[in-house]
A protein has these predicted regions:
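Charged helix-capping and loop-helix junction motifs
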Residues: 41-47, 78-86, 115-125, 177-186, ...
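Histidine-acidic metal/acid-base catalytic patches
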Residues: 2, 16-18, 148-156, 160-164, ...
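A short acidic, helix-capping loop that chelates divalent metal ions and anchors anionic groups
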Residues: 35-36, 68-73, 108-113, 174-175, ...
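N-terminal pre-domain/capping segments
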Residues: 1-64, 68-88, 255
Length: 255
């Protein structure tokens, strides 16, 4: 497996405890909300004041903005707002020295025909990537995607070596019509990053590895078999369950 990150889903003092205990990276979610990016210096100065020591010499991932945005929108003003926010978040990632940034797929199959979604999204991503170098990996994450074939086709058409898929296994468990095994076999080496958590298949509750109906270890074995060493973020909202999940990953990796 590749690099391991913990998502900053609980108070900073608890994140600090985990990062002091384990040699892992941090996925920052603070810049995923638009009003943070509206602050002076896109919120970086304020974040550094609180967390400068926490992130020093640490692998970082940024969760990009997602609320009210849409890469596939027919409305040019919405697409431009999305482009602005994505560029702001990318700039934050660059200045913090992040390894990667994660953006949602924005696919709603009850709204968009597949071909329309792919064409609109492709236009957006081609514009976004014009001035991006290879220093940051960009991952497109499944959210409400029912059929992951659509995301596969989009990534293939973008055809960039810095673009890959972030497979969120919790989202897939709740919203996809396909099993995780089918999805992993379908996407294969296109999976560059993982969001790992568990749920009951009904609500995206971000539970720990042992608190849901996903067999996380079996899923990771499929990842080992069909993918190319993706990085992963443990995206669990409960502190104790997050610690337990990290321990499970560490024990598995040390076998």
């Amino acid at each position: 497996m590749g690099k391991i990150y913990i998502s900053q889903l609980f108070p900073e003092e608890r994140v600090n405890k985990i990062l002091n205990k384990y040699d892992i990276g941090l996925e920052i979610i603070e810049f995923g909300i638009g009003y943070t990016l509206d602050k002076d210096d896109n919120g970086i100065v304020e974040y550094y004041k609180r967390n400068g020591e926490l992130i020093k010499n640490r692998s970082l991932s940024i969760h990009g903005p997602f609320l009210d945005l849409n890469t596939a929108s027919f409305d040019n003003m919405i697409k431009q707002a999305t482009l602005t926010r994505y560029n702001q978040a990318y700039s934050v990632a660059k200045r913090l020295g992040a390894d990667r940034i994660v953006f949602h797929s924005c696919y709603y199959d009850d709204v968009y025909f597949k071909d329309v979604y792919i064409n609109n999204s492709l236009e957006f991503w081609n514009e976004f990537l014009i001035d991006k170098d290879e220093s940051i990996n960009i991952h497109i994450e499944n959210m409400y995607d029912k059929d992951l074939l659509v995301l596969k086709e989009l990534v293939d058409k973008i055809n960039s070596n810095i673009i890959s898929i972030c497979l969120d296994i919790g989202h897939a468990n709740c919203y996809s019509n396909q099993s995780l095994e089918e999805i992993i076999k379908l996407l294969g080496s296109r999976i560059g990053h993982l969001h790992l958590n568990n749920n009951d298949g009904k609500k995206d509750s971000h539970r720990g590895f042992n608190s849901g109906n996903i067999d996380v270890i079996e899923t990771l074995e499929l990842i080992d078999k069909y993918c190319n060493n993706p990085s992963m973020t443990i995206e669990v909202s409960d502190f104790k369950e997050a610690e337990e999940s990290i321990s499970i990953i560490m024990k598995r990796n040390n076998k």
